[in-house]
C-alpha cells in the first residue's frame, strides 16, 4: 500500500506525526509513505523506515515571491512529483486550508482528513472525501494516531506511541564525556525562560562537573548562547547545525532542558531524558511526548494563557519579590533555577538516564 502524507510544518507537528507512521507500519505490513513537508524540515521524515520518499514543499518561501516561483518552474515540478505515483490514499494530517489545497493536485486518489469539528481550520474538511472525527483536549500525537487508525482501518494501539527512530544510528559513535543540552531558543517571546535563569542553571550544573552545550538557530540565539556560556569553562556554544547535526548532538546527550520548542520534541523523539519548561502553553496538548519526559508547568494564576504577548499586570507584591526587568514573563518565576536544577539532578539519577 502506498500513501501520500501531507504534513508540512511546524517542526514539532512533523515530529508528532512519526508515531502514527509506526502504528501503520506495524498494522499493515509493507505500507509505504511519501511525505509532503516544508523544505526546512525535510530531513526528519527520511529518518523513519516507513517513509519511501520525501517531497519538499516551500510554501513559506514561495509566498514571498509568488511570481518568481511560477516563472522558475518550482511550482510546476512540485505538482508533477505528486502525480508520479498512483497512491492508494492521501492523508492530510495538518487540517489546514494550505495543506488541504495541496491535495487537489494528486488526482482522483481519495483524500482523508479530519472532519469539520476536528480540524484546526474547518473549511479544510471540504477537500476530503473521507473525514473523520478526532476529539480535542488530548495530545497532538494521540490525535494524529487516531486519524491514521481510522483512515487506514486498523485498531488503535493502546501502547505509548513509538517515533520509530533509531537513536544509536543518529548518534555520534563516540560522544565523549557526558554532557547536557540547553534548548533555550523558541518562537513566542512569552515561551522564553528568562535569560538570567538559564545563566544561573548553567553555572549550577557546571559547578557540579557537567558540560553544557548550547545550540542556536538565529543571530539572537547565538548571542544569547554566548552570554550564557561566557566565563564558564564547561559550557560551549555549538556551531550552526542542520537538523541531522542537531539530532546527533541530542542523541548523545545525557539529558536536555528545554522550553516549548521544536527541538525539545526532537529530543523526546530520540528518547533523550528532557525537562521541559512551560509558562503560557499547555504541555497536556503539545508537550514533549514519550518516555523519560518531565514537564514543569507554571501554576501562575493566568497560566497557561496561550498568548504570544504577556498581558499580566504586576502587583505591588510582584514588584517586591521579582526583578521585573530580568524575570519576564512572570509566570516563569514559579519555575526558578533552583527548582529546575533540583528536578534536573533527580532526572540525572534516574535509572533510565544512567546509561
From Swiss-Prot:
Gene this chain is encoded by: waaC
Upper lineage: Bacteria, Pseudomonadati, Pseudomonadota, Gammaproteobacteria, Pseudomonadales
Residues that, per the record, bind ADP-L-glycero-beta-D-manno-heptose: 186-187, 191, 221, 260-262, 265
Record GO terms (molecular function): ADP-heptose-lipopolysaccharide heptosyltransferase activity; lipid A-core heptosyltransferase activity
Keyword Nucleotide-binding applies: no
Additional detail: Can complement a S.typhimurium mutant lacking this gene.
Protein name as it appears in the record: Lipopolysaccharide heptosyltransferase 1
Membrane topology classification: Peripheral membrane protein
Cellular compartments annotated: Cell inner membrane
Catalytic activity: an alpha-Kdo-(2->4)-alpha-Kdo-(2->6)-lipid A + ADP-L-glycero-beta-D-manno-heptose = an L-alpha-D-Hep-(1->5)-[alpha-Kdo-(2->4)]-alpha-Kdo-(2->6)-lipid A + ADP + H(+)
InterPro entries recorded: Glyco_trans_9, LipoPS_heptosylTferase-I, LPS_LOS_Heptosyltrfase
Pathway(s) where this gene product acts: Bacterial outer membrane biogenesis; LPS core biosynthesis
A GO biological process held by the record: lipopolysaccharide core region biosynthetic process
Amino acid at each position: 500500500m502506498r500513501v501520500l502524507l501531507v504534513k508540512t510544518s511546524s517542526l514539532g507537528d512533523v515530529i508528532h506525526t512519526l508515531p502514527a507512521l509506526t502504528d501503520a507500519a506495524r498494522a499493515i505490513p509493507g505500507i509505504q509513505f511519501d511525505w509532503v513537508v516544508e523544505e526546512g524540515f525535510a530531513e526528519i521524515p527520511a529518518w523513519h523506515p516507513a517513509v519511501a520518499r520525501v517531497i519538499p514543499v516551500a510554501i513559506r518561501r514561495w509566498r514571498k515571491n509568488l511570481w518568481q516561483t511560477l516563472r522558475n518552474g518550482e511550482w510546476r515540478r512540485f505538482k508533477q512529483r505528486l502525480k508520479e505515483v498512483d497512491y492508494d490514499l492521501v492523508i492530510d494530517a495538518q487540517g489546514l486550508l494550505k495543506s488541504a489545497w495541496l491535495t487537489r493536485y494528486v488526482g482522483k486518489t481519495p483524500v482523508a482528513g479530519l472532519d469539520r469539528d476536528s480540524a484546526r481550520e474547518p473549511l479544510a474538511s471540504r477537500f476530503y472525501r473521507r473525514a473523520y472525527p478526532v476529539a480535542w483536549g488530548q495530545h497532538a500525537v494521540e490525535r494524529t494516531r487516531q486519524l491514521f487508525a481510522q483512515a487506514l482501518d486498523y485498531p488503535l494501539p493502546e501502547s505509548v506511541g513509538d517515533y520509530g527512530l533509531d537513536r544509536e544510528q543518529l548518534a555520534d559513535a563516540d560522544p565523549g564525556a557526558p554532557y547536557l543540552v540547553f534548548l533555550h531558543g523558541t518562537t513566542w517571546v512569552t515561551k522564553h525562560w528568562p535569560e538570567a535563569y538559564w545563566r544561573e542553571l548553567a553555572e549550577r550544573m557546571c559547578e557540579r562537573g557537567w558540560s553544557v552545550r548550547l545550540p542556536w538557530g538565529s543571530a539572537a540565539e547565538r548571542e544569547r548562547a554566548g552570554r550564557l556560556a561566557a566565563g564558564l569553562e564547561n559550557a560551549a556554544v555549538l556551531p550552526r547545525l542542520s537538523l541531522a547535526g542537531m539530532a546527533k548532538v541530542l542523541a548523545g546527550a545525557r539529558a536536555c532542558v528545554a522550553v516549548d520548542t521544536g527541538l525539545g520534541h526532537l529530543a523526546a523523539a530520540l528518547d533523550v531524558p528532557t525537562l521541559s519548561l512551560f509558562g503560557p502553553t499547555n504541555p497536556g496538548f503539545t508537550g514533549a511526548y514519550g518516555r523519560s519526559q518531565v514537564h514543569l508547568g507554571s501554576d501562575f494564576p493566568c497560566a497557561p494563557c496561550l498568548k504570544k504577548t504577556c498581558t499580566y499586570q504586576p502587583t505591588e507584591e510582584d514588584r517586591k519579590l521579582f526583578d521585573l526587568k530580568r524575570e519576564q514573563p512572570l509566570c516563569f518565576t514559579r519555575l526558578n533555577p533552583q527548582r529546575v536544577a533540583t528536578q534536573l539532578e533527580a532526572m540525572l539519577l534516574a535509572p533510565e538516564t544512567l546509561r
